[in-house]
Amino acid sequence: MESIQTEREDKFDVDADFQLPTLASLVPTGGALVSSETDLSSEYFDTAGHDLLRRGITLRRRTGDSDNGWHAKVPAEKARTEIRLPLGNGANNAVPDELNDVLRGAVMGAELSAVATLTTRRTIHTVSDADGAVVAEVADDEVSVVLIGGATGPQWREVEVELGPAGSESFLKKAGK
């Protein structure tokens, strides 16, 4: 079964030696800050002509954390609409029919296939309010790319601040400073 949600996040490209500042000032009164690390693998899909990339759409199959599954992200003003399906949808890593149907217009009938695999070492800091609701997740990612065919792609580091159900635009502004 698919789920659809709106995703609101800000991303920051940072240098390899960047030191994430303390996040204690972002924790609401009575809230908590919990940190963990994980390794992610995300296989990205597109057409031979990169139709999704040209439209700002991403399609991936992710493993390695609680966000496992198929994710199609479609741009919208200040946010993205994210369509999620479980890993079981899509035999042998093939794009699930449900996502092929949703993206058919964007790819104009072209075949979707794997184009790259991103490996991410993620340190995630979850900020919760006094009731335990997630305000935001701050992810510090070290990313490397392998293109289909085995060529090594770029490596980079980025910090992502994604609002949770209890988050607000003011949190993003404060976190971005």
Regions found by a protein language model. Name each.
Residues 1-177:
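Phosphate-end processing signature that detects enzymes handling 5′-triphosphorylated RNA
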